Amino acid sequence: MEIAALVSGGVDSSVVVHQLKEAGYDPTIFYIRIGMEDKDGYIDCPAEEDIEITSYIARKYGCRFEIVSLHDEYWDRVVSYTIESVKRGLTPNPDMMCNKYIKFGCFEEKWGKDFDKIATGHYATTTEIDGKTWLSTAKDPVKDQTDFLGQITRLQIQKLMFPIGHLMKSEVRAIAEAQKLPSAKRKDSQGICFLGKINYNDFIERYLGKRPGKIVELETGKVLGKHNGYWFHTIGQRKGLGLSGGPWFVIQKDIKRNIIYVSNGYDPETQYGKVINMQGFDFITEDPWGEFEGEKEITFKIRHTPEFTHGYIRRIGDLYRVESDEKIQGIAPGQYSVIYDKDHHLCLGSGMIIDETK
């Protein structure tokens, strides 16, 4: 079996190569250069150390090694999407778009098509049911990354391998240390890759500029201060508002009037909701329900967290609606609600959250 292993230089993808070799495979290692390019040139993830480590892994295990670039595709599919989403007052999820369109989309079209499987360091597993492949959760509930994979397709999941999905993070690090891999003690990556060391607000300002507006208390209508543009703020945000007498949380955004609405307190009721409307829904393997009336029991996530929330999903025309058993903090339009079966084992798919008041 011909396997392409996507290796970033981090501990997880490095251990993927070890696991594949232990299983008797001879993977070809690919390092994907991603980042962004505009008229002023590249703003890239710091890649030199990553490539050096990945090259060492390839030599250690005797694997073929290729460095490939998807800069332009990353700009078109991920960076532009992020900028446009923020401009529309939405909260983007670039990680989901990168997995769907870059790692398992453009890479597949250019190089992956020549391989039987693509292996990655995601904390996820696959489950075979009646000859069909389903995305399923990892052994490590804290590191589980199925929510970042909630937009992939049936054809993509059929081809994916997750060699560390059955391991705890501590086990992965132990393997890396035992094998003396240079990535054994590297910290996990944080934040949006294409920004590198660039501050997120500096990035937003570069492409959207500033537009001063009012910060208003939701309950009273009192003007509390000013902001530099609604696109610098997201629903549920607490830090960076510059207001005294806090804590303050961003509750709503009026993008037409450029107003940020906030509520005061450590746990304001206004930041919670129980209804999540999704604009369409993308199933990964297949629609397990078909046409149905009433509701289906599910678990779900609206952000990257170890916890699953229990609820029910309904179909209203083309709209899917999740009704949560418990109140959810910071339901942000633009983010994705990732849906699982009631036992939170199978990841069924996801839909983009729209304003729940509509």
Swiss-Prot record:
The record marks H122, Q335 as: Interaction with tRNA. Residues 93-95 are annotated as: Interaction with target base in tRNA. It comes from Parabacteroides distasonis (strain ATCC 8503 / DSM 20701 / CIP 104284 / JCM 5825 / NCTC 11152). Keywords: ATP-binding, Cytoplasm, Disulfide bond, Nucleotide-binding, RNA-binding, Transferase, tRNA processing, tRNA-binding. It is an enzyme of class 2 (transferase). ATP binds at L6, V7, S8, G9, G10, V11, D12, S13, I32, G121. The keyword Transferase applies. Gene3D superfamilies: Adenine nucleotide alpha hydrolases-like domains, HUPs, Translation factors. InterPro entries: MnmA-like (IPR004506), MnmA-like_C (IPR046885), MnmA-like_central (IPR046884), MnmA-like_central_sf (IPR023382), Rossmann-like_a/b/a_fold (IPR014729), tRNA_2-thiouridylase_MnmA (IPR051305). Disulfide bonds join C98-C193. It is found in: Cytoplasm. Belongs to the MnmA/TRMU family. Pfam families: tRNA_Me_trans, tRNA_Me_trans_C, tRNA_Me_trans_M. GO terms for biological process: tRNA modification. Its EC number is 2.8.1.13. This is tRNA-specific 2-thiouridylase MnmA. One of its GO terms (cellular component) is cytoplasm. One of its GO terms (molecular function) is tRNA-uridine 2-sulfurtransferase activity. It catalyses: S-sulfanyl-L-cysteinyl-[protein] + uridine(34) in tRNA + AH2 + ATP = 2-thiouridine(34) in tRNA + L-cysteinyl-[protein] + A + AMP + diphosphate + H(+). The active site is at C98 (nucleophile), C193 (cysteine persulfide intermediate). Residues 143-145 are annotated as: Interaction with tRNA. Its main location: cytoplasm. Catalyzes the 2-thiolation of uridine at the wobble position (U34) of tRNA, leading to the formation of s(2)U34.
